[in-house]
């Protein structure tokens, strides 16, 4: 999980979602997991 000020999709399988008011990227590739904060 990377925590970044701005999250972006890295590949086609990445999905940007909102969970509990936080913007997150989830993906099949676990290296692409990101959270805004």
Curated annotation (Swiss-Prot):
One Gene Ontology term, aspect cellular component: ribosome
Q: Which InterPro entries match?
A: Ribosomal_bL36 (IPR000473), Ribosomal_bL36_sp (IPR035977)
Keywords assigned by UniProt, alphabetized? Ribonucleoprotein, Ribosomal protein
Q: Which domain of life is it from?
A: Bacteria
- Give the family from UniProt: Belongs to the bacterial ribosomal protein bL36 family.
Name the record gives this protein: Large ribosomal subunit protein bL36
Q: Which GO terms describe its biological process?
A: translation
The encoding gene is rpmJ
Q: Which organism is it from?
A: Frankia alni (strain DSM 45986 / CECT 9034 / ACN14a)
**Single Gene Ontology MF annotation:** structural constituent of ribosome
Q: Which PANTHER family match?
A: 50S RIBOSOMAL PROTEIN L36, CHLOROPLASTIC, LARGE RIBOSOMAL SUBUNIT PROTEIN BL36C
């Amino acid at each position: 999980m990377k925590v970044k000020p701005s999250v972006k999709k890295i590949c086609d399988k990445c999905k940007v979602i909102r969970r509990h008011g936080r913007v997150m990227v989830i993906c099949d590739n676990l290296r692409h997991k990101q959270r805004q904060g």
